[in-house]
Structure formats: C-alpha cells, structure tokens
C-alpha cells in the first residue's frame, strides 16, 4: 500500500500512522518496499508518498492552505509506485456511487489490469459488517461489473457496521496547525492494537473486517471461486498465526 502520514482536509487515521504505531518502518524506499513484496516470507509493504514522489508530497502545505478537497486527492491513489511483472491490481473503497465509474476509467488509464472498488465508510476498504455490501470491479481492463455480498453468508454476525471508536477520544495536542479534534496518533495506536490482536486470532469486529476484506480480495483475484471458501482460508491463517507471522516479517 502507499499513502501519507496526514492530509487536508480531514487529517484522519492513515495507515501510515497505524503501521508506525504497530512498530513498522514507514520510511522504506521504493526498492526496499518492492523487495519486501517479492519476498514470499513477507509479501506486503508500505511506501510513503514522501519516498516515491517527493515533489507531490511537497504540495502538502499548499493543500492544507487550500483546505477543500482537490482533484489531486482523487488521482494520487492511482499512482502505483510499484508494479507487478505480470499484472497489477487496484483495490480501494468508495463512498459515493458516481466515483466508481471515474475510478474505473482512471485505473485503466493508469495501467491497472484489475480494479476492485468496495462500498465502504470513509477511509476504509471493508463493507458494512451488518448489511449487504456492494463492489464494482473489472478484470483485464474490461468493463465494470457489480456484485453484492452479505456478511452473514460468510459467517459474520455483527451489530456494528464497523469497529467503533471509543466514546471519549484523546484530545488533540494544542497546535497552530489545522488538524483533527482528537489525538490522531493515540487513536492510531488503538487501531494498531486492535489489528494486532485480530492478526493473533482474537475474534471481534476487527477480526471480521479482516476476514471480509481479504476474502473479497481473494475472490476478485480468482484465487477462490466461492467467497465463503476465501473467508474460511483467511480465518485459517488468522487463527494459526501465519498472518501475524507475515506481518512481523516486514520491516
């Protein structure tokens, strides 16, 4: 994955912050990230925008001053700093339905062989855990298709749509900068702790979110024709420690 530490206008909980809170190196070079991806004992990596496109990252202050969402926010997620030798797939979340067509066209133009867009809550890649979810996707740069998924069919029974934040969040440190109303780093640590617990097989909403998102990804990549089988495989690697082993194998 790739991203930034924080960005206007929402200054939310980025995966940069969550991974850093989990003890991961978020300053890898593009080559270091590529090496981790190609290592079968690791198989994943994060590379920051500061490393793969410093000129774009230098616009952060300007974007903060503009405040409102800019067009660059839509297209920067498709930069794809690391590409596969055979195929490269794009996976992201969307909130507003009109964006699916836009992202699909952009993904094709950017050279992504496959594209998977999941109807989510802002900033995530997991559908609602308690109601039917929808994805739009294409294979081999073809036309978009739609698919509905019911979390109950995967054995997911939750009363919440997503893992809830605590009722009382740590207040943001005093600063002259425009920022979120809560301490983003402290909340990122909460998210990291919940994620590590789920990777260690602790069941709950975070565990179910991992099962759901990963199962959809495996289904889209045609690793499993049946998403229920994909979900069972994800549970297996969460419960036997393999998923956590791969997470810890990364820098």
Indicate residue ranges for each PLM-predicted region.
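A glycine-rich phosphate/pyrophosphate-binding beta-strand-loop-alpha-helix module
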Residues: 1-31
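Glycine-rich anion-binding loops and their surrounding alpha/beta cores
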Residues: 20-27, 32, 38-251
